[in-house]
Amino acid sequence: MANLCEICGKGNNSGASVSHSNKKTKRKWKGNIQKLKAMVDGRPKKVKVCTQCIKAGKIERAF
C-alpha cells in the first residue's frame, strides 16, 4: 500500500540536495501521512490521511 493521502493524493516528492559547491544528490520529501480511524460510508475504517486534510476537516474521525 502506497504512502499516499486517500483524500488529496499527496505523497512523496523527489528532487535534489544542492551543496554550496553546487553538487547535487537525489533526495525525497515525505508527506506527513497519518493512519487514523475515520467514518467511511457510515462505518469506521483505518485510512491514511495527510495532516493538511485532517486540519481542514475533510475527514470525519471515528472515536
From Swiss-Prot:
Residues 11-20 have a biased composition (Polar residues). Keywords: Ribonucleoprotein, Ribosomal protein. Residues 11-30 are annotated as: Disordered. GO terms for biological process: translation. Residues 21-30 have a biased composition (Basic residues). The keyword Disulfide bond does not apply. Transmembrane segments: none annotated. It comes from the Bacteria. GO terms for cellular component: ribonucleoprotein complex; ribosome. GO terms for molecular function: structural constituent of ribosome. PANTHER family: 50S RIBOSOMAL PROTEIN L28 (PTHR39080), LARGE RIBOSOMAL SUBUNIT PROTEIN BL28A (PTHR39080:SF1). Belongs to the bacterial ribosomal protein bL28 family. This is Large ribosomal subunit protein bL28. It comes from Natranaerobius thermophilus (strain ATCC BAA-1301 / DSM 18059 / JW/NM-WN-LF). The gene is rpmB.
